[in-house]
């Protein structure tokens, strides 16, 4: 029987970290065996590559030293000849002969030794570079079959093998989105003004989740600066009583603040659960877990107690675990009874352990927003990670490096995603309550949602859809229409801005007692829209878990050949 996870930190340390390592190693070994990589031949080739690169670095260093010597000798020779010519009537003949002879010897040494050595070293470097390039091409050929076996779902399959009750969808379907709306009260207003860069949907303990990264434009402000230098003269009397003219200058500076489109990207975990259906709160990282003796902890504790005594603050009442209340701080919650049912003593204990640990996990680095049945976790540690899971990142010409990178990359992603779920796993009720659809069966409609369409458009890139005059990033929005042949035509609209140069004159008072117009160049932004289309086809064939990676690739090839499309990404073939 699969056990629930009530202490995600300890489960990661004692179970999942090592289990994922084993799964990743077994997955890579299976891929390598399937690809029939000649490991020894590749190891020999790579050793030759690295030796060649080291030799090239040594030759480059020697070339640098000989070039320095060459420059010094030529400068010395030229100076010597110049001295002999210019000072021929001033210096004794012996000195002139000594200087001239030294210059001649320098030139002879340059022509006989230095330049031939440089030529030889450059030739050796070029030959070695060609040899290394040929060896690298050979290494890529040796690894070609393995590099072809990586796919977009390799990490999610490994995660599902590692963590019980964690399932990933092939792609974010309309049914999954409809379930979030109907069962959990999801509101599509979240997507207004946002474009989905990527999304991974699925179930954990039978409840739906979406890991997504979005781009949003907000009109901010930018300050532009200009300056003007003014000059004037005054008449002054010096200490001797004489009148004189004094010149003055001053640089006047001015600024113009104008609207400026700013773009923000954010990665979130959105999770639906019917537990505590009326509860609303949001919390931000406090950094106070484990700092009970600090002045800030005591101050926050004082204010929370004061708020709890204030009847005007509604339903807020502190739990007996004051350390948890201060560190987790959800004093803006609207329903204390449901909060207490959700955050039991066991949940509080697990959450505090999670907040304190910065070694295995990430500590207190997440926002936790609950809006009735929708929970949103925004972890800081995922903001700099690209969780699109592009398989190109695994490709390498060196088998040993590929093996090392495969584990390290996936272990980093697994840790980041696992600890995004961890705040939810701390709550026992979230694992004890599942939707009726999960209990009594699932009838998943395999049509991709607009989230997936926007992610696909962003995968193809803004450049394909942006307006020719656009000078900013774009927010890509889509609309879809199913075609008679089963494919889908996606219309993409790229919302961006063009800019127009402006010149404003700002009056500034100068030291000469006059007002001056200081020019400031700035830009005014106007919205523009670009358009384009993507043809896509969803591969809805149920995947056999026993299928080999070669069989998966053959299936992908069949889909691309059948649909005449270019790219297969996460069970969707497409062409832009």
Where are these predicted regions, by residue range?
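Acidic, low-complexity intrinsically disordered regions
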Residues: 70, 89-95, 148, 182, ...
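Soluble extramembrane domains of integral membrane proteins
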Residues: 133-276
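Transmembrane alpha-helical hairpins and terminal membrane-anchor modules
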Residues: 60-136
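Intrinsically disordered, low-complexity acidic Ser/Thr-rich regulatory segments
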Residues: 114-152, 308-329
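Basic, amphipathic N-terminal segments
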Residues: 1-65, 132-165
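Alpha-helical context
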Residues: 11-14, 18-21, 25-28, 32-35, ...
């Amino acid at each position: 029987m699969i056990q629930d996870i009530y202490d995600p930190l300890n489960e990661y340390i004692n179970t999942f970290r090592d289990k994922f390592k084993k799964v990743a190693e077994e997955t890579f070994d299976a891929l390598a065996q399937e690809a029939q990589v000649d490991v020894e031949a590749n190891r020999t080739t790579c050793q030759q590559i690295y030796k060649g690169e080291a030799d090239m670095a040594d030759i480059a260093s020697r070339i640098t030293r000989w070039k320095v010597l060459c420059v010094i000798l030529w400068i010395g020779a030229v100076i010597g000849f110049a001295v002999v010519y210019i000072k021929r009537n001033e210096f004794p003949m012996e000195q002139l002969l000594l200087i001239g002879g030294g210059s001649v010897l320098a030139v002879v040494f340059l022509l006989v030794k230095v330049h031939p050595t440089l030529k030889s070293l450059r030739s050796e470097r070029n030959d070695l570079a060609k040899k290394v390039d040929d060896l690298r091409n050979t290494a890529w050929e040796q690894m070609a079959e393995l590099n072809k076996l990586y796919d977009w779902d390799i990490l999610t399959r490994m995660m599902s093998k590692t963590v019980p009750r964690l399932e990933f969808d092939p792609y974010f379907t309309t049914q999954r989105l409809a379930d979030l709306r109907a069962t959990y009260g999801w509101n599509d207003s979240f997507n207004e003004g946002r474009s989905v860069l990527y999304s991974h949907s699925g179930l954990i303990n039978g409840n739906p989740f979406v890991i997504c990264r979005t781009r949003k434009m907000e009109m901010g402000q930018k300050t532009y600066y200009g300056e003007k230098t003014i000059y004037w003269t005054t008449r002054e009397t010096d200490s001797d009583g004489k009148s004189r003219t004094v010149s003055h200058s001053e640089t006047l500076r001015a600024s113009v603040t104008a609207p400026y489109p700013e773009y923000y990207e954010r990665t979130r975990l959105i999770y639906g659960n019917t537990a505590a259906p009326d509860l609303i709160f949001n919390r931000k990282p406090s950094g106070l877990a484990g700092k009970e003796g600090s002045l800030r902890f005591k101050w926050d504790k004082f204010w929370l107690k004061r708020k709890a005594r204030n009847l005007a603050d509604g339903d807020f009442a502190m739990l007996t675990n004051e350390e948890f209340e201060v560190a987790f701080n959800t004093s803006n919650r609207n329903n204390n009874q449901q909060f207490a049912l959700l955050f039991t003593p066991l949940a509080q204990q697990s959450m505090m352990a999670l907040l304190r640990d910065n070694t295995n996990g990430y500590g207190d680095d997440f926002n936790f927003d609950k809006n009735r049945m929708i929970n949103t976790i925004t972890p800081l540690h995922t903001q700099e990670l690209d969780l699109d899971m592009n398989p190109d990142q695994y490709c390498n010409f060196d088998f040993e490096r590929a093996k090392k990178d495969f584990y390290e990359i996936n272990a980093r992603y697994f840790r980041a995603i696992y600890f995004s779920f961890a705040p939810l796993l701390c709550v026992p009720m979230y694992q004890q309550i599942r939707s009726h659809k999960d209990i009594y069966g699932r009838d998943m409609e395999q049509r991709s949602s607009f989230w997936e369409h926007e992610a696909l458009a962003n995968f193809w890139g803004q450049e394909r859809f942006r307006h020719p005059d656009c000078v900013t990033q774009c927010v890509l929005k889509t609309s879809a229409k199913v075609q008679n042949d089963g494919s889908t035509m996606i219309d993409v609209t790229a919302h961006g801005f063009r800019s127009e140069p402006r010149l404003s004159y700002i009056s500034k008072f100068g030291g000469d007692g006059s007002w001056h117009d200081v020019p400031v160049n700035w830009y005014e932004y106007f919205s523009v829209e670009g358009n384009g289309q993507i043809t896509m086809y969803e591969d809805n064939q149920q995947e056999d878990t026993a299928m080999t990676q070669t069989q998966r690739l053959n299936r992908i090839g069949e889909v691309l050949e059948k649909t005449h499309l270019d790219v297969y990404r996460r069970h969707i073939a497409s062409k832009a």
